[in-house]
From Swiss-Prot:
Purpose of the protein: Plays a critical role in cytoplasmic virus egress. Participates in the final step of tegumentation and envelope acquisition within the host cytoplasm.
InterPro entries found in the cross-reference section: Herpes_UL7
Gene: UL7
Protein name as annotated: Cytoplasmic envelopment protein 1
GO CC, alphabetical: host cell Golgi apparatus; viral tegument
Family under the similarity heading: Belongs to the herpesviridae cytoplasmic envelopment protein 1 family.
Keywords: Host cytoplasm, Host Golgi apparatus, Virion, Virion tegument
Transmembrane segments: none
Localization of this protein: Virion; Virion tegument; Host cytoplasm; Host Golgi apparatus
Organism: Human herpesvirus 2 (strain HG52)
HAMAP family: HSV_CEP1
Superkingdom of this protein's organism: Viruses
Keyword DNA-binding (UniProt): no
One Pfam family cited in the UniProt record for this chain: Herpes_UL7
Length: 296
């Protein structure tokens, strides 16, 4: 069995090879594979009674960390310097009857193909979950994730990266391993932060937390590449059996930032259609907390 190359060392396949060869303990294998899972395509969900829902990935236009380590946001529709404390926005959302929480997609790192997801629409319905934070820290993390995914290149600066990384480090030091959703949010933010740094031409804090297809795209899609190279970063067209089981809904209720460096997947109609179909279906919405088994 061939040894994994340095670029492959963090992948699930490489971890399994090392486990079979006896080079890793069972605990290391479990942790290594679970670290490949992350949340993507976070967006706020709002709906008034039975009217058309609204999915917004751009409600947070800017994030800042104060000298005291507090998060504050510039919200959609506000001026560039109209910062709102994260706790105030948390309370505001909780008080609004239209606020439903956040929709998120569970992926492995290798399923993010830059311009699309390597998950067919039918399967995507089972990867979506609804997250309605009851704790300020979790709310801050999902808002930060949503912002990083839609961060425009003009905001992707070393100053932002350092502030966000330091804040995540503080949150991680106080997070219990039993806070499964919080740990998943932290891991997701680290994946997106390091990948965003790579795409912005800044040395990532951790090269192993750069999404693999994005790492390749950073080099291969520069300088107007031929279509054959661009096609590598779009998922393979799926058969009709893997499409949505009903009529494709309208997707004009999904708001995202086309200029977001990490948000190009939002251009995929399959993703937007699956999101709206999932929400409008009569089936109960899986909660993000239910993604984890309880052993005690």
């Amino acid at each position: 069995m061939a040894d994994p190359t340095p670029a492959d060392e963090g992948t699930a396949a490489a971890i399994l090879k090392q486990a079979i060869a006896g080079d890793r303990s069972l605990v290391e294998v479990a942790e290594g594979i679970s670290n490949q899972a992350l949340l993507r395509m976070a967006c706020e969900v709002r709906q008034v009674s039975d009217r058309q829902p609204r999915f917004t990935a751009t409600s947070v236009l800017r994030v800042d960390v104060t000298p005291r380590g507090r998060l504050r946001f510039v919200l959609d529709g506000s001026s560039d310097d109209a910062y709102v404390a994260s706790e105030d926005y948390f309370k505001r959302c909780g008080d609004q009857p239209t606020y439903r929480g956040f929709a998120v997609v569970v992926l492995t790192a290798n399923e993010d193909h830059v311009h699309s997801l390597a998950v067919p629409p039918l399967v995507l319905l089972h990867r979506l979950s609804l997250f309605r934070p009851t704790d300020l820290r979790d709310f801050e993390l999902v808002c930060l994730l949503m912002y990083l995914e839609n961060c425009p290149r003009s905001h992707a600066t070393p100053s932002l990266f350092v502030k966000v990384s330091a804040w995540l480090g503080v949150v991680a030091r106080h997070a219990s391993p039993f806070e499964r959703v919080r740990c998943l949010l932290l891991r997701s933010c680290h994946w997106i932060l390091n990948t965003l740094m790579c795409m912005a031409g800044v040395k990532p804090f951790d090269d192993e937390l750069v999404l693999p297809h994005w790492y390749m795209a950073h080099y291969l899609l520069a300088n107007n590449p031929p279509p054959v190279l661009s096609a590598l970063f779009c998922a393979t067209p799926q058969s009709s059996a893997l499409q949505l089981p009903g009529p494709v809904p309208r997707t004009d209720c999904v708001a995202y930032n086309p200029a977001g460096v990490m948000g190009s997947c939002w251009n995929s109609k399959d993703l937007r259609s699956a999101l709206v179909y999932w929400w409008l279906s009569g089936s109960p919405k899986r909660r993000t907390s239910s993604l984890f088994y309880r052993f005690c």
